[in-house]
Swiss-Prot record:
Entry cofactors: Mg(2+); Mn(2+)
Top EC class, one word: transferase
Subunit and partners: Heterodimer of a small subunit (PriS) and a large subunit (PriL).
Family statement drawn from the similarity comment of this UniProt entry: Belongs to the eukaryotic-type primase small subunit family.
Domain of life of the native organism: Archaea
Alphabetical list of Pfam families matching this protein: DNA_primase_S
Name of the protein this chain belongs to: DNA primase small subunit PriS
Gene: priS
Keyword set includes Transcription: yes
Keywords: DNA replication, DNA-directed RNA polymerase, Magnesium, Manganese, Metal-binding, Nucleotidyltransferase, Primosome, Transcription, Transferase
Role this protein plays: Catalytic subunit of DNA primase, an RNA polymerase that catalyzes the synthesis of short RNA molecules used as primers for DNA polymerase during DNA replication. The small subunit contains the primase catalytic core and has DNA synthesis activity on its own. Binding to the large subunit stabilizes and modulates the activity, increasing the rate of DNA synthesis while decreasing the length of the DNA fragments, and conferring RNA synthesis capability. The DNA polymerase activity may enable DNA primase to also catalyze primer extension after primer synthesis. May also play a role in DNA repair.
HAMAP family: DNA_primase_sml_arc
Amino acid sequence: MNPATTEFVRQRFAEYYRKAMLVSPSSLAQREWGFVLFNPGAAELRMRRHIAFPERTELFDYIRNLVPSHVYYSSAYYEKPDAPTMAEKGWCGADLIFDLDADHIVKGPYDQMLSRVKTETEKLLAMLTEELGIDSKQIELVFSGGRGYHVHVRDLAFRGWGSAERRELVDYICGIGIDPAVLLNGGLVPGWPARFRSALAEYIGWLGTLSEDGAMAHLTSLEGVGKESAAGFLKKRAEILAGLSGEIDPTLLKDRVIKAVVHETEGEFRKRLNEKAALADEPVTTDIKRLIRMPTSIHGGSGMRVQPLELRDLPDFDPLVDAVVFSAREVRVDARFPLAMPMLGSTYQIQKGISTVPEAVGVFLCCRGIAEIA
């Protein structure tokens, strides 16, 4: 941002913070805080951190006076959160955090990325509550203000977990390290055994959409599968599909084609299996000293609100409407390239150069580095 754009965005943030009803995390006095300031012309973002607040009024006053571009707090609880080094802080545990960010999931138009990452978030929440038995009252859901969602699990049972335990959990969520033999022998139970069977059934169904020559060519391209094995597999395709809905025939696990298919690291079956995982960002979950965005703050890279949500509200939540905090009054921006920007229920066609857009769109474009204020 140039200085004029920085000042424009900072003034909008200041206006928001003057009026907004801010919220603070639980156990405020045990949290470390970090702030990124508006710094026109800076080559990189620098964070002011190792700060603590005993009371929420002190925190809110600090934010309103400082007007930061980003606000973070620690998922960890510390004895001395404002100590200048991590070793001196005295770690007392950390919330279990999951980050679902479109950067790690899908590329494409912004609204389509947001839609896809919502689907991944819904899968994660279902796994946590229905499969792992975590009480939904212990889960806090937050739109990150950028390209995804943060899921905070406050349950004390997880607070003392180290990185290794958290990695095992996120690996389960993401379907990493699953054993095909165990899953196919898992019986008619929910969770990964059911997902594995479903993915295999979908794969076999997909084979049925190919011509006989096409199916043979595909199967014989798999490691260790010859023409005889492939032809035999195709003849008993219906029998195998029926078997996947009941108790597995032990001989199925020895089938050369099945073994080749389920041990592939990529391909048509693996693609279908991966779609059943929730694609959380593993480093965020395993980091027991992570800084995470403060709900109700503004994301300095988008100008949108870091929006806390009730779990039941996620299906109807539209970030490009519900997390927008700035007005529809018109401002002039100078865009670096043409684009279509969906926001506030409309799609704005923005040309390269000078355009007039709603303030909310203008703030977004400036924060993303797509435009300067004109």
